[in-house]
Regions:
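A generic structural signal for short beta-strands and their flanking turns/coil linkers
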Residues: 50, 61-65, 82-86, 103-105, ...
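Short, acidic/charged, Gly/Pro-enriched secondary-structure junctions
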Residues: 77-107
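Detector for glycine-centered tight turns/loop "hinges" at secondary-structure junctions
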Residues: 20-21, 98-100, 144-145
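A short, compositionally biased
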Residues: 7-11, 83-87, 134
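Mixed-charge, glycine-accented linear interaction segment located at domain edges/termini
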Residues: 112-175
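Beta-strand elements of well-folded, non-transmembrane domains
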Residues: 69-73, 90-96, 111-115, 135-140
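Short linear motifs in intrinsically disordered
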Residues: 1-6, 75-82
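Solvent-exposed edge beta-strands and adjacent loop segments
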Residues: 1-70, 110-121, 162-174
């Protein structure tokens, strides 16, 4: 058996607006659900013993974050902004000690809201709502360790410490 820490469950989530890169003190949404970005690469199909899809790992397809709020009011508060921070804590079991503790994660993302669900209102319901953000910037941290850093405006794509665009950027800059 390997000594891999177990990330058991998400214990709490808070979403903050971050206008001009400054995180607001109070969250806009608490105990909401955040679907973190999926990083997928565009592919080109070539013929090599049949068809074969080759991923262009220096580029990414559309990067989206979905925030499911517990009320329409929370979603409306988020709609006023283009930069966000989602913080969540996971209950973690340390493989070496067997002890449980919390691990903090932070997702910084900015872009344009693609869609906003109008929500559902019914007797006894919370009138929940969902917004989808198309991200031009996305950065995910586990504590202070950077897991993903994608910035379309700067041509940055770093995944688990590996700069996926460094060679391409050097060629484009003539270095």
């Amino acid at each position: 058996m390997s000594n891999i820490n177990r990330y058991v469950t998400v214990a709490g989530v808070a979403v903050y607006a971050a206008p001009d890169g400054i995180v607001q003190e109070q969250p806009c949404a608490v105990d909401s659900e955040v679907t973190l970005a999926t990083i997928s690469h565009p592919t080109t199909t070539i013929n090599m013993m049949g068809s074969y899809d080759v991923a262009d790992t220096a580029n990414v397809d559309n990067v989206q974050v979905t925030i499911s709020c517990q009320s329409v009011i929370e979603a409306m508060e988020l709609l006023k902004h283009e930069s966000f921070v989602a913080r969540f804590a996971m209950l973690t079991e340390d493989a070496s000690t067997g002890l449980s503790d919390y691990t903090g994660f932070t997702a910084y993302f900015s872009g344009h809201v693609q869609s906003s669900g109008g929500g559902t209102a019914g007797v006894g319901s919370a009138a929940d709502s969902t917004i989808v953000v198309n991200c031009s910037k996305y950065r995910l941290l586990q504590g202070s360790v950077e897991l993903i850093n994608m910035d379309r405006l700067r041509g940055t794509l770093v995944i688990m410490g590996v700069d996926k665009r460094s060679k391409l950027n050097k060629l484009l800059e003539g270095r």
